[in-house]
Amino acid sequence: MANRISVELPRTSYYTGDVVAGAVVLQTDKEVDARGLYLDVLGRESTVISRGSGKQRVTYRSQADILGWRLPLHAAGVVPPGVQRFPFQFQIPVYGLPSYTGTHAKVVYAITARLDVPWWPDAVRNETIFVFFARESVRTFSNPVRFWSGDPNDQTGPQVYVELDGDRFFARELIGCRITLLRLGDHRVRRVYVRLVGGEWARAQRAEETTTTTISELEIPMESIRVGQPFTFEVPIPADIQSSYKGTYSYYSYLLRIGLDIAWATDLVAETPLVIVR
C-alpha cells in the first residue's frame, strides 16, 4: 500500500503577518524507513514574457523568492505504522506581497509536505494559500488628494480640478470624488467620463510588458454639472479586484482618470495613482 499524507489547515486565506498553524497527517500501513518528513514553505514572485512565434518564439523568465523555508517534522529513521499528526507553524512576513495572478506576473504561496522514502515514490501533498495585505498596513487614516489637469499654474484654458477623500482604498469601498470645471469658454463638453484603470508591469530578464485594464467606468452628463461649481459623486470599487503591490520584477497599480470629452478638440484629462487592495 502507498503511504498517504495530507495537510490540515484551519483556512486557506491569510493576511501578511499572520501565523499559519496546521498539521501534516501521515498514514502508513507498515513501518517505513524514511530519510525524513518535512514541510517546504515557498512564496515566489515570477514573471514570464514570450516574444516571436513558431520556431522564433523566445520565452523569458525571472523569479524572486519572498520566503523559502524547510520545516523538519520527523528525522531520518523508521516511521511506525498507523496515523500520526505532526503540527507545524510559521509566520507570513509582515512586508510580504499579496497573492496575485496576472497576464505576465504572479505571486504564489504554497506549502508542500513530503515523506522522503528511498527507492520508493515519496508521499507528497501540495496546498496553496492565499495572502492579502493586512488592512492596518495599508491605511490608518485618510489622506485627501487634490490634482488638476495640465499645469495648475496655467490660467488661460479649460481645466478640471479634482478632490478625493483619500489615496488608499479597499475592495467594495466607494471613492468619494468632487470635480470643478473651470474656464470652459466656448468649448463644448459633451460628457465627463471617469475611469478606474488597473495596470500590470512585468520584467523577465531583458523583456518588459505593460498591460492595462479598465476596472470600472462611469459617465456624468454635462446637464448635471455647472461650470465653476463643485460636483460630488462616488466611484464604486469592485469586490474581485487585484491588490496593488510592488515586487522585484513586477508591480500592479491603479489610476483614477477623469476626462472631459470636448467636441472638435483633444480630451482634457486629470489623473492620479491610487493604492487599492482586497
Tell me the role of every PLM-derived stretch.
Residues 1-278:
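C-terminal beta-sandwich interaction modules and adjacent acidic
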